[in-house]
Amino acid sequence: SNGGKEIVLTGVNIGDFGKSTGETFIDLIRALDKVEGIVRYRISSIEPNLITDEAIDFVACSRRFAPHFHIPLQSGSDEVLKLMRRRYDTTLFRHKIEKIKEVMPHAFIGVDVIVGTRGETDTCFEEARTFIESLDISQLHVFSYSERPGTQALKIDHVVDPKTKHARSQQLLDISDRKLHAFYEAHIGQKANVLFEQTRKGGMMHGFTENYIKVEIPYDHSLVNETRQVILEGWNCLLYTSPSPRDTR
């Protein structure tokens, strides 16, 4: 009712939607895709075991769902994933990434990882780092493990010291920087539709492409909450395809 054009689906285990009603996540996104007036939906933070191949195929063909996924991995070591009691392993995770890229080669995939968990030995971390490096993803969200009273993790003997946590975090952040740079570079010169936001900073405004590339231009109030086609010119820069931004509504 306020004129919003993009909705992000988020929550705790959104892939479990409908368990109490007999509905499924694919039922939800199919219904949302039919709602008029919404330009884009994004799927945020859905676990790999809960995003089905059917849902991935649907997003690839959808009129409104963006080719943008945020998928928690937490660790690229199967041993650590077992300690975390995750409902997936690295084999399943790799399959989901490869499936997304098969049907949406330009999809943006953000991945959550945690470093320094109890039980993450040097060997486990190296396995995780190697696995993450091998994935065709766009960006990592790296978090350092912190102790919480009363959790089962406190029963695990191996503790990672703060200095090692920081070093491991930095290694993964370096990987993230390289992957994001490569993802952006691959799109330079391409046309894209950008939905511009209201935020104004230093005389500039920004928006995002369907596959979550952030672009920046001089502030123009008439473009707020509007979608325009642009040519991606460089890092956070763009060149309009005509003297005036092209309306893609």
Positions of predicted regions on the chain:
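Radical SAM enzyme [4Fe-4S]-AdoMet core and its adjacent flexible, acidic
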Residues: 18-37, 84-87, 147-178
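A short, hydrophobic C-terminal helix/tail in secreted or cell-surface proteins
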Residues: 243-249
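Terminal RNA-binding accessory module
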Residues: 155-242
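Proteins enriched for Cys/Gly/acidic motifs involved in redox and nucleic-acid/cofactor modification
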Residues: 1-16, 69, 91-102, 126, ...
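Conserved SAM/AdoMet-binding glycine-rich loop
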Residues: 2-125
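Hydrophobic, well-ordered secondary-structure elements that form the walls
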Residues: 71, 112, 132, 140, ...
